[in-house]
Amino acid sequence: LQSQRKREEKNEGMMKCSLNDFDIADGGDRLNYDGGALREPMTGKGRYDLISPFALDRLAKWYEKGSKKYPQNNGRNWEMGMPFSRYMDSAKRHLNKFLMGETDEDHLAAAAWNIFAIMHHQERHETRWDDLPKYKKMEDVR
């Protein structure tokens, strides 16, 4: 019952389905294009157009393979969380295998997947999964 409640809370934000439920965000600034069209500047919104479609394709295929291997939570097993140390260990292992020339798996996509998973949990402020050591430089310790 408690897990069902958590799923319902998680999905509550996704239940909006009518345009009447949303406002259009407005930063106030406008760019005027030669044809007369107006649009907000892109600064600070990210440059999705710079993400390599090849890298994104490999990463998406890795997500697909993972969803088949771990079908729990409708293939979104990883979103349920695990310690960052587990993701980090796997990312480093896959990078090392790539550096050693191993080609049995897409080791770069696997490493990227693990790093993306950590970033996802960071953005959601899921600090309970952050079990990584907190190192400090000697100059910071003094």
Describe each model-derived feature in a short phrase:
Residues 1-142:
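Intrinsically disordered, low-complexity regulatory regions
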